[in-house]
Amino acid sequence: MAVTSDRKNNRKKAITKFNDLDFVPTISDSEEDVPDLDDSDDELLTSENKSVKTPAKSKKGKKNDPVKINGNGDEVAEDLNPDFRFNIDGGELSTNFQGWDFVGDQKENDDDMKKDVDLDGIIRRKGGLLNMAHIEVAEEEEEEEEEEEEEEEEEEEELAMDGFGMGATKKNEQEEAGDEDDDDNEEEEEEEVDDDKEDDDEEREEDTAEEMASFYAPESESSEATSTVHSTFNSLTLSRPVLKGLSDLGYTKPSPIQSATIPIGLSGKDIIAGAVTGSGKTAAFMIPIIERLLYKPAKVASTRVIVLTPTRELAIQIADVGKKIGKYVSGLTFGLAVGGLNLRQQEQELKTRPDIVIATPGRFIDHVRNSSSFNVDSVEVLVMDEADRMLEEGFQEELNEILTLLPSKRQTLLFSATMNSRIKSLISLSLRKPVRIMINPPKQAAARLTQEFVRIRKRDHLKPALLFYLIRKLDGTGQKRIVVFVARKEMAHKLRIILGLLGMKVGELHGSLTQEQRLQSVNNFKSLEVPVLICTDLASRGLDIPKIEVVINFDMPKSYEIYLHRVGRTARAGREGRSVTFVGESSQDRSIVRSAIKSVEESSSKNKAVSRNVEWTQIEETNKLVESFGETIDDILVEEKQEKEILRAEMQLRKGENMIKHKKEIQSRPKRTWFQSEAEKKNAKILDTLQKNKKTVNSKKRKRLEALEDNDNSRSYKKTQKDRVVDQERSMKKQKIANGKKSKNKKKFNKR
């Protein structure tokens, strides 16, 4: 009791002494006047640093003992907190950041029922994935010497604009059409390729100076933003919680896009920003958003920020970026609304009205229309990541619907590596004098990227063997992350089987997988459990997985913009990277190579474009082994299909049991609505396909496509020669009958 009364008296003296001051004093103002209030708190030490008692000392002596001994026998001063640890580098360099987390549903009751086919198990039963296929390869020392010689050759063989015969005139070659696949309007670039659109970008009309002056903010604002260089995040006047979150991520200096956009974002102005891949665009819009949310009303829960992305994986990644940056901001909440994940779980999350909602367009509209307690009336900021993709035809209808749902008075931020600045496509977004910030020249690859090209000529059948050869050459130990891009998901799946039979474990990522399988593939690749990931253009945008050393373009993309997004998965954030592209003889392939070489020649960065030489004799030997797997591959596909059918039947059985068990609850749920009818969705899909392929929309074509849709894409009946003969005979009979009637009528008329 005496101790507590002394402490109260000391506090009163300290308060009365500083009562007349106009400022709040700190300890450094007068260290002598700081009352000693913690004399009685010396016993509150942690369990790790318990004092070692000596038998000859009394309680009084123990209190006055200035030194204690911890469990390790080390002396510790009593006035120091034993749990305190000095952070020598201020958290700037000692980060253990290993990349963003890709976490889907947190399922509480996850039953043990098998949900996916074990493809690796099937391949293993057929003799694959055991030992790496051994094709006659030189010894390790000779390999290293060859690699060194090859690198020297590559440096000498830098491609010029006429490389690969780029100056030769060739007839346009038709590429095979890919199957249509509309999986939640995601980034599945599998439609028909048309070589005639290789010069589309050159033919596209450019905005006039008058149009740009009336639409954009004054050029002075943009130039001032890009010319102002911030050496640290402290100079951006950010709050301490945000700075602490950035420090934990290892962010020490803002990138050019962050330095330019953060001050404008904090001021509430609209932004249209573009920068090369891996330059930190996600943090560039997330930092000012979180900083502004520090000043939100504490007691009113409402959704204030919407972030739209074209793919589910990108949305999950952005949510993790935001959570890590806002880790120390109290009361900041995030919500996720993406397709493929648990709908009810997302509804419960959105009922709490999180501050920031990251979503894909389709699922966002679904929740706004059908989820109770979730509304967007208080939205203040709309962000569109990969905005050029979001403005394309595939998302147009949904984007227009979203813009009608959101308040017109809002801040809009558009970000992309290949930002389309056409004013015509931006008018629908209701932007208010947006500030246009383009850090790098448009359509430029990241710095420190080495772009290699392998000329295939007429050896398309050797591409799987070439892929195996390159992966072994670039990473024989399986310690590098390699991404392989293909045009079609069927090819991605087939390559996984082929490489598995050759003893190489790889993953796949495309729209035919469930969302759980997709996230599992990304996480396995991130943890190097699977060092090679074969994917479609679903993964070409936004995904930031650390230390991807190599990108291989197994199939050439259909445009240079998609090529930039693909190779942008490596050489991120100032790191070195390498891309290897298989180049065919089509004019489209040549056009993309020309654009890449031109970009390298015009840039002042350290990237380069070279021709890669390969051992075709060794690749042909590997191809013989691949061709011998023909029947085995078919057997694996058949067995996989059978297992899928069994799993599907089990799922339907379980679904039926649940419908019987929870019949009343299911029937009591209101029917979910959509802003388009089935007929409208079908017409929009057809028009979208026709416009993408640059074909005229006429009624005959539309009716044929609608008939195909109604018949589940089954082929319409085509007349045979026999049918034509029958039709001709029938028409001739009708003509004879008609002529006979005419002659009879004529005779009757003459008699009269």
Curated annotation (Swiss-Prot):
Assembly description: Associates with pre-ribosomal particles.
UniProt family annotation: Belongs to the DEAD box helicase family. DDX27/DRS1 subfamily.
GO biological processes: ribosomal large subunit assembly; rRNA processing
Coiled coil feature spans: 631-698
GO CC terms of this entry: cytosol; nucleolus; preribosome, large subunit precursor
Subcellular location: Nucleus, Nucleolus
Domain Helicase ATP-binding: 262-437
CDD domains given in the database record: DEADc_DDX27, SF2_C_DEAD
Protein name: ATP-dependent RNA helicase DRS1
Binding of ATP, residues: 275-282
Biased composition (Low complexity): 219-228
Regions of compositional bias (Basic and acidic residues) in chain numbering: 712-732
Major subcellular location class: nucleus
Purpose of the protein: ATP-binding RNA helicase involved in ribosome assembly.
Classification via SMART domains: DEXDc, HELICc
Residues of the Helicase C-terminal domain: 448-611
PANTHER family: ATP-DEPENDENT RNA HELICASE DBPA (PTHR47959:SF1), ATP-DEPENDENT RNA HELICASE RHLE-RELATED (PTHR47959)
UniProt feature, compositional bias: Acidic residues: 29-45, 138-160, 175-210
Keywords: ATP-binding, Coiled coil, Helicase, Hydrolase, Nucleotide-binding, Nucleus, Ribosome biogenesis, RNA-binding
Region (Disordered): 24-82, 130-228, 695-752
